[in-house]
Amino acid sequence: MGNVISGGSRPENHRDRTSPPYPNPNAQYQGNYPSPYQDCARYPYGEMASPVQYVEHQEAVTIRNDINLKKETLRLEPDEQNPGKFLLSFTFDASVPGSITVMFFAKEGKDCNLIATKEDLFPSTQVSFAKGLEQRFKQACGTGIDFSDMSEADLVEANETDVYHVAVKAEVVSEDDHPESGTPNRQITHVVLEKDHKGEYKARVVKQILWVNGNRYVLQEIYGIGNTVDDNGEDANERGKECVICLSEPRDTTVLPCRHMCMCSGCAKLLRFQTNLCPICRQPVDRLLEITVNNNDRN
């Protein structure tokens, strides 16, 4: 007798047992098999690149600063009439008359008011000044600080309690007989005292604050905006001031928080959609600040 195939069934299809069966709508399969074209449907041209983080672009607001202490000029000088004491000196510009107050071991209070914490040991001094540029300030003889009156522990304790070793307050004096109510405009300079490799104390500015029209501002350096003059009288800011991207337009945009002024506003607006890294230091960028600088001719 021959072989009989009952029910008209087809011979078994010998497939690779390692591959999943073809989809069958009548099969009671629990679960889903991955599609070989699933990733191609999502990324037809390969893996999608992550989007660049949006960087905010802002324009700077000009604030009038009537008094400016040049922090790079601040130093301690020996008191020739009082051996062992040191006097604070610095250079400043003032467009209006005002007063300068020097405090030792002072902390900042409300509305940028300074509070002397050791007034009995280190009395504060105050002097008035007229308006003018490149004025030099130096404490009067006998009013300086004697380092033998303090210890290393005093300096460390001050740092841990938000007390600055030295604080300089440059304050505007009202030109009329009826000064405005509230705290007058002022600039506060906070200084710490540190020993150098010779064991001598040096003064170092750590913070400068502006109080203008009831608002508090912290001053920060911007790299690439300084106006310097070389030995030949040439403005160094005129050389190499071009945008580092297009190499043609002047720099007017600062990268924050690294504070590199390195781009023009046009390149900055385009670059913020392509990368969020500073072109100079490659640090992440939070904001772009457009600053208009007016370089007036020096007299």
UniProtKB/Swiss-Prot annotation:
Enzyme Commission code(s) on record: 2.3.2.27
Name of the protein: Probable E3 ubiquitin-protein ligase LUL2
Entry keywords, A to Z: Lipoprotein, Metal-binding, Myristate, Transferase, Ubl conjugation pathway, Zinc, Zinc-finger
Molecular function (Gene Ontology), one example: ubiquitin-protein transferase activity
SMART domains on file: RING
The record's note on its domains: The RING-type zinc finger domain mediates binding to an E2 ubiquitin-conjugating enzyme.
UniProt-annotated stretches for the region Disordered: 1-33
Protein family according to the UniProt entry: Belongs to the RING-type zinc finger family. LOG2 subfamily.
GO biological process terms, semicolon-separated: protein ubiquitination
Organism of provenance: Arabidopsis thaliana
UniProt cross-references to Pfam families, sorted A to Z: zf-C3HC4_3
Reactions listed under catalytic activity: S-ubiquitinyl-[E2 ubiquitin-conjugating enzyme]-L-cysteine + [acceptor protein]-L-lysine = [E2 ubiquitin-conjugating enzyme]-L-cysteine + N(6)-ubiquitinyl-[acceptor protein]-L-lysine
Pathway entry: Protein modification; protein ubiquitination
Catalytic EC class: transferase
